[in-house]
Design a protein with these regions (language model features):
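Active-site-proximal mixed secondary-structure blocks
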Residues: 1-37, 45-120
Protein backbone atom coordinates (compact mmCIF):
# COMPACT_ATOMS: atom_id res chain seq x y z
CA UNK A 1 0.00 0.00 0.00
CA UNK A 2 1.39 3.37 -0.98
CA UNK A 3 1.44 6.33 1.37
CA UNK A 4 0.88 8.72 -1.55
CA UNK A 5 -2.44 10.56 -1.63
CA UNK A 6 -4.34 11.38 -4.80
CA UNK A 7 -5.12 15.07 -4.81
CA UNK A 8 -7.57 16.80 -7.08
CA UNK A 9 -5.79 19.00 -9.59
CA UNK A 10 -7.10 22.54 -9.34
CA UNK A 11 -7.24 24.61 -12.52
CA UNK A 12 -7.20 27.93 -10.73
CA UNK A 13 -4.14 30.17 -10.52
CA UNK A 14 -5.07 31.71 -7.16
CA UNK A 15 -5.89 28.43 -5.44
CA UNK A 16 -2.59 26.90 -6.52
CA UNK A 17 -0.32 29.85 -5.82
CA UNK A 18 -1.60 31.42 -2.61
CA UNK A 19 -0.56 29.60 0.53
CA UNK A 20 -0.51 30.95 4.06
CA UNK A 21 1.71 30.00 5.57
CA UNK A 22 3.84 28.95 2.62
CA UNK A 23 4.24 25.16 2.84
CA UNK A 24 7.62 23.49 2.81
CA UNK A 25 8.28 20.87 0.18
CA UNK A 26 11.05 18.38 -0.35
CA UNK A 27 11.96 18.47 -4.03
CA UNK A 28 13.36 15.21 -5.31
CA UNK A 29 15.50 15.16 -8.44
CA UNK A 30 17.79 12.71 -10.21
CA UNK A 31 21.54 13.20 -10.13
CA UNK A 32 23.78 12.51 -13.12
CA UNK A 33 24.51 9.02 -11.79
CA UNK A 34 20.78 8.22 -11.51
CA UNK A 35 20.53 8.46 -7.73
CA UNK A 36 17.82 10.52 -6.08
CA UNK A 37 18.61 13.62 -4.06
CA UNK A 38 16.31 15.75 -1.91
CA UNK A 39 16.25 19.46 -1.18
CA UNK A 40 13.82 21.45 1.02
CA UNK A 41 12.17 24.59 -0.35
CA UNK A 42 9.38 26.90 0.73
CA UNK A 43 9.49 29.32 -2.19
CA UNK A 44 7.75 27.10 -4.70
CA UNK A 45 4.33 27.33 -6.31
CA UNK A 46 2.99 24.55 -8.53
CA UNK A 47 0.60 25.63 -11.27
CA UNK A 48 -1.89 23.78 -13.41
CA UNK A 49 -2.84 26.61 -15.73
CA UNK A 50 -0.93 25.77 -18.89
CA UNK A 51 -3.42 23.17 -20.11
CA UNK A 52 -4.46 19.65 -19.30
CA UNK A 53 -1.21 18.04 -20.46
CA UNK A 54 1.19 20.62 -19.01
CA UNK A 55 2.26 21.58 -15.54
CA UNK A 56 4.43 24.47 -14.43
CA UNK A 57 6.01 25.69 -11.22
CA UNK A 58 7.81 28.70 -9.89
CA UNK A 59 10.84 27.75 -7.80
CA UNK A 60 13.16 30.25 -6.12
CA UNK A 61 16.58 28.69 -5.59
CA UNK A 62 20.27 29.21 -6.28
CA UNK A 63 21.16 28.35 -9.86
CA UNK A 64 24.15 26.40 -8.56
CA UNK A 65 22.11 24.18 -6.22
CA UNK A 66 21.92 20.44 -6.81
CA UNK A 67 18.17 20.83 -7.32
CA UNK A 68 18.50 23.56 -9.95
CA UNK A 69 21.26 21.76 -11.83
CA UNK A 70 19.31 18.47 -11.86
CA UNK A 71 16.11 20.17 -13.06
CA UNK A 72 18.01 22.01 -15.80
CA UNK A 73 19.60 18.75 -16.95
CA UNK A 74 16.58 16.41 -16.66
CA UNK A 75 13.63 18.79 -16.83
CA UNK A 76 11.89 16.78 -14.09
CA UNK A 77 11.35 16.83 -10.35
CA UNK A 78 8.79 15.76 -7.77
CA UNK A 79 7.28 18.07 -5.14
CA UNK A 80 6.76 16.26 -1.84
CA UNK A 81 4.76 18.33 0.64
CA UNK A 82 5.75 17.72 4.26
CA UNK A 83 3.92 18.31 7.52
CA UNK A 84 4.73 21.22 9.82
CA UNK A 85 5.99 19.22 12.80
CA UNK A 86 9.28 20.49 14.28
CA UNK A 87 10.84 17.02 13.96
CA UNK A 88 10.09 16.99 10.22
CA UNK A 89 11.56 20.48 9.76
CA UNK A 90 14.74 19.45 11.59
CA UNK A 91 15.20 16.63 9.10
CA UNK A 92 14.48 18.96 6.17
CA UNK A 93 17.10 21.48 7.37
CA UNK A 94 19.75 18.74 7.35
CA UNK A 95 19.25 18.47 3.58
CA UNK A 96 19.63 22.17 2.88
CA UNK A 97 23.28 23.13 3.32
CA UNK A 98 24.80 24.75 0.22
CA UNK A 99 27.74 22.78 -1.11
CA UNK A 100 26.64 19.45 0.38
CA UNK A 101 26.98 16.70 -2.16
CA UNK A 102 24.10 14.20 -2.50
CA UNK A 103 26.53 11.35 -1.79
CA UNK A 104 27.26 12.98 1.60
CA UNK A 105 23.76 13.95 2.73
CA UNK A 106 21.52 11.19 1.38
CA UNK A 107 22.92 8.30 3.48
CA UNK A 108 21.91 10.29 6.62
CA UNK A 109 18.47 11.21 5.25
CA UNK A 110 15.57 10.12 7.48
CA UNK A 111 12.88 10.60 4.81
CA UNK A 112 11.66 7.28 3.46
CA UNK A 113 12.04 6.81 -0.28
CA UNK A 114 9.13 5.11 -1.96
CA UNK A 115 9.13 3.73 -5.49
CA UNK A 116 6.24 4.73 -7.68
CA UNK A 117 5.48 3.95 -11.30
CA UNK A 118 4.34 6.83 -13.46
CA UNK A 119 4.30 7.89 -17.08
CA UNK A 120 5.73 11.21 -18.15
Amino acid sequence: MSSFENLRVVDNFYQTSLFFPMPTVIISTLCEDGTTTLGPYSLVQPYYVAGKDYYAMLLCCRNSSNTAQNILRNGKCALNFIDDKPKTFKEAVKLSWPGDKPSEKMPKCKFKMEKIAYNL
